[in-house]
C-alpha cells in the first residue's frame, strides 16, 4: 500500500488492514523516512503543505528503491505481488508498474500517472479517478487506456480527489466501496 503525501497515517494503516483482512500480506512502506522519519500528517492546510514539501524533496525516483525492496521481500516469500497507491502513491504505483521487477498487478487512485505516460506498464494496471477532481483530470484514465489498451483499465467516479479517504471531507462512501470492489476483483484475477 503506497501512501498519499501524508505519510503512513491512520488512513493508510486502515487501508493496509483492510487488504490484510482480505487475506493479503501487506506492507505500507514509510517512504518519507528518508527525509522525515516517522512523520504522520493529517489533512490541515499546514499538513498538506508539509506533505507536498517532503514529496518535492523526495521526488518520484527515491521512493522506488523502497518500493522495490518491499516487492522483493514479498516475492522472496513466494507471493504474487500487487501495489495499490493513493494520490502521490497513485503516481508511484504507475511508475512501479513500469520500473519495478516482480509486480503482477498495480492499482492507482487519483494519481498523476499521466505525468509518466511514456513509461509503459509491465503489468496490468487499474486506475480510479474522481470526475470532480480539480487536481488530477479524470480524462487521464481514458488517455492512458488509449495508450496501453492491453495493460490499463480506468474508472471514473462521481467524486472528488481523495474520495477513498474516510478522514477527509472529500470522502465518497459509494464511490470508495465500488472502487475497492473493483480493486479486489482485479487483484483476485492477477494475484489469486
Predicted regions and their residues:
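N-terminal cap/leader regions of alpha/beta-hydrolase-fold enzymes
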Residues: 1-192
Amino acid at each position: 500500500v503506497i501512501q498519499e503525501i501524508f505519510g503512513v497515517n491512520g488512513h493508510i494503516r486502515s487501508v493496509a488492514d483492510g487488504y490484510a483482512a482480505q487475506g493479503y500480506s501487506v506492507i505500507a512502506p514509510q517512504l518519507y523516512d528518508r527525509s522525515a522519519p516517522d512523520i504522520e500528517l493529517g489533512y490541515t492546510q499546514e499538513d498538506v503543505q508539509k506533505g507536498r514539501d517532503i514529496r518535492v524533496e523526495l521526488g518520484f525516483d527515491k521512493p522506488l528503491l523502497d518500493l522495490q525492496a518491499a516487492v522483493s521481500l514479498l516475492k522472496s516469500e513466494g507471493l504474487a505481488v500487487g501495489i495499490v497507491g493513493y494520490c502521490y502513491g497513485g503516481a508511484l504505483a504507475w511508475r512501479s508498474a513500469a520500473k519495478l521487477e516482480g509486480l503482477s498487478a498495480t492499482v492507482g487512485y487519483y494519481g498523476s500517472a499521466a505525468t509518466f505516460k511514456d513509461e509503459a506498464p509491465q503489468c496490468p494496471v487499474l486506475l480510479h479517478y474522481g470526475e470532480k477532481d480539480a487536481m488530477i483530470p479524470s480524462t487521464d484514465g481514458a488517455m492512458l487506456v488509449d495508450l496501453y489498451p492491453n495493460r490499463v483499465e480506468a474508472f471514473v467516479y462521481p467524486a472528488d480527489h481523495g474520495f477513498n479517504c474516510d478522514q477527509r471531507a472529500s470522502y465518497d462512501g459509494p464511490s470508495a466501496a465500488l472502487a475497492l470492489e473493483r480493486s479486489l476483483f482485479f487483484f483476485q484475477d492477477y494475484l489469486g
